[in-house]
């Protein structure tokens, strides 16, 4: 079953002689359950591609479909909702709020989306991540891996 389809994706930054091509007609299909790695030299477009897939950086042209849904075929409001509810990214450099504990950092996006926190799911996530004993710790009290 097709999970991700990218068709002729292009991304340009700047204009004229200062224009930089970050993505040049990238096409890719990933089936559900398939594991892929995106590798390349620094500046080769890896982060730009991932940001485009996640709906964070709008491509110059081309299409991205996640679970059959056209990521950029929706208005900005629906794209923001889609991003919050359907996409997850783990950055190399995390952006945790230093004054919030583990539980507060995990639940903040749900609360900002005006939804109720599912306590059972929260406890499952904490167990899966091995953070049950550290759920009230601040980010600076966690290892780098735990922060991710």
Task: Indicate residue ranges for each PLM-predicted region.
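ABC family nucleotide-binding domain
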Residues: 2-148
